[in-house]
């Protein structure tokens, strides 16, 4: 595996000079763009993503960039990985609990808190662009958190059930 393709959820990237290694390029000139790798593709959309999802990514990534972000110690790294795995494998389970630095919380509570904390960013993006697209998409995400039947995974499960298709097929 080449050094600029190591797996991580978000990769810092830069187009380097001819013959320059990716890490050398980043060290020399900084991050030019990021590659977001842990976003699900929506199977019901021709491109896998639509404009509201792009607006949500704008909100989320801007919000992330504005957060204090110290170094992650080994214990926190392990907790993040456990939470990630739980959401991937059990994310539809009602009442799913995750570990935070301050104790356990449900996925629904944590997601709601995160979406609420993103509200000012969505408002600023909308104010700057004279529209309400970001606040609208934040509302759509809140609806999915409150009622998982609005998620793409719920739609997939409904189709499987309606067509009598086993999940493993």
Question: Residues of each region from the PLM?
Answer:
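C-terminal accessory/tail domains of diverse enzymes
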Residues: 1-169
């Amino acid at each position: 595996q080449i050094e600029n393709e190591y797996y991580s959820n978000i990769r810092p990237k830069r187009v380097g000079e001819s013959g320059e290694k990716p890490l050398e390029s980043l060290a020399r000139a900084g991050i030019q763009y990021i590659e977001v790798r842990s976003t699900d593709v929506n199977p019901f959309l021709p491109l896998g993503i639509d404009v509201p999802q792009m607006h949500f990514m704008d909100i989320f990534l801007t919000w992330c960039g504005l957060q204090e972000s110290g170094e992650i110690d080994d214990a926190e790294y392990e907790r993040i990985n456990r939470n990630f795995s739980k959401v991937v494998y059990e994310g539809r389970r009602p009442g799913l609990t995750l570990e935070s630095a301050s104790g356990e919380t449900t996925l629904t509570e944590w997601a709601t808190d995160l979406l609420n904390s993103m509200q000012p960013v969505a408002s600023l993006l909308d104010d700057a662009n004279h529209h309400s697209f970001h606040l609208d998409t934040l509302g759509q995400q809140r609806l999915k958190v409150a009622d998982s039947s609005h998620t793409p995974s719920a739609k997939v499960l409904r189709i499987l059930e309606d067509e009598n298709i086993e999940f493993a097929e």
